[in-house]
Swiss-Prot record:
Protein keywords: Cell inner membrane, Cell membrane, Membrane, Protein transport, Translocation, Transmembrane, Transmembrane helix, Transport
Organism: Alkalilimnicola ehrlichii (strain ATCC BAA-1101 / DSM 17681 / MLHE-1)
Entry's Gene Ontology BP terms: protein transport by the Tat complex
GO cellular component terms, semicolon-separated: TAT protein transport complex
A molecular function GO annotation: protein transmembrane transporter activity
Tagged with keyword Transmembrane helix: yes
Record-stated family: Belongs to the TatA/E family.
Subunit structure: The Tat system comprises two distinct complexes: a TatABC complex, containing multiple copies of TatA, TatB and TatC subunits, and a separate TatA complex, containing only TatA subunits. Substrates initially bind to the TatABC complex, which probably triggers association of the separate TatA complex to form the active translocon.
Cell compartments where the protein resides: Cell inner membrane
Name of protein: Sec-independent protein translocase protein TatA
Length: 90
């Protein structure tokens, strides 16, 4: 009990009458451009990923350096902020 060819033809004819050929052509052109842009972006992303893998190994793949037990050599990045002021001081 699928869609018969006659039913499909009638639906397409109604869509053509409602939207008109010019509007359907513009929508088709816009959809085609969007699909082409998406495919181009996917190709660029894959090429960029391949180049990135060849140029530099990631930091996670490098063997870890020996850690010092005293804690020397550890740096915490950030900005120093002022101490909060007491609002109730006289």
């Amino acid at each position: 009990m699928g869609i018969s060819p006659w039913t499909l033809l009638i639906v397409l004819l109604i869509v053509l009458l409602v939207f008109g050929t010019k509007k359907l052509r513009n929508m088709g052109t816009d959809m085609g451009g969007a699909i082409k842009g998406f495919k181009d972006a996917m190709k660029e992303g894959e090429e960029g990923a391949k180049e990135g893998e060849k140029s530099e190994p990631s930091k996670l793949e490098q063997p870890p350096e020996e850690e010092k037990e005293s804690g020397e050599g550890h740096t915490i990045e950030g900005e120093r902020s002022e101490q909060p002021r007491d609002r109730h001081s006289s």
